[in-house]
């Protein structure tokens, strides 16, 4: 008779308590599926996926978006993951995936609510808030369409342009600017995960 698998009771109610890794793969918890106008996010206090916002008509999420459990990014949330897969998943779905890189960026918020005190010299200290907001890029383990994608360089240049355009418009909806800092490889992505794990443990 086979032994029963050990389960973490907390993870059954809170997916953010699942392990971020399964062997050599990361475990991505989907929040918002590809093609969706609704932005969903996991509410840690209430233990449920909640609607955060609705994108304007004609604007949808270009890929499945989720997070890695037991991590903490610079923006105060678990580290974000953009997941490449054949068809959209659903909120709360656990998907094993392999990292291929990271999209590094920062969001810029004008705390004064206008341009007067923006980046001009002599403006009030703290008038502009910059926050790193990186997104890991991963490929689902179960995929046909993206099976040959092993690194970011395997993706067409148009993919990056469309991704950058989406985030510029997405952050603009909240009155924030988005600056793309660049793309880095799978090793850099893994380093980001380890740093986010360390931050979560020390919280």
What do the PLM-derived regions correspond to, one by one?
Residues 2-203:
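Hydrophobic N-terminal alpha-helices or hydrophobic patches in metabolic proteins across all domains
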């Amino acid at each position: 008779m086979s032994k029963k698998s050990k389960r973490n009771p907390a993870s059954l109610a809170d997916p953010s308590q699942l392990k971020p890794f399964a062997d050599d793969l990361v475990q991505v918890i989907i929040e918002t599926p590809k093609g969706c106008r609704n932005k969903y996010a996991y509410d840690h206090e209430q233990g449920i996926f909640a609607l955060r916002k609705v994108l304007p008509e004609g604007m949808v999420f270009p890929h499945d978006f989720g997070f890695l459990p037991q991590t903490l990014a610079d923006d105060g949330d678990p580290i974000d993951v953009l997941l490449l897969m054949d068809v959209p998943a659903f909120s709360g779905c656990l998907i094993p995936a392999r990292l291929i890189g990271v999209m590094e960026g920062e969001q810029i918020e004008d705390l004064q609510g206008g341009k007067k005190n923006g980046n001009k010299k002599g403006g009030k200290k703290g008038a502009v808030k910059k926050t790193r907001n990186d997104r890991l890029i991963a490929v689902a383990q179960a995929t046909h369409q993206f099976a040959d994608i092993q690194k970011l360089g395997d993706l067409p240049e148009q993919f990056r342009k469309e991704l950058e355009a989406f985030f510029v418009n997405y952050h603009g909806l909240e009155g924030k600017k988005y600056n793309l800092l660049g793309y880095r490889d799978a090793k850099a992505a893994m380093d980001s995960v380890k740093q986010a794990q360390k931050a979560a443990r020390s919280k």
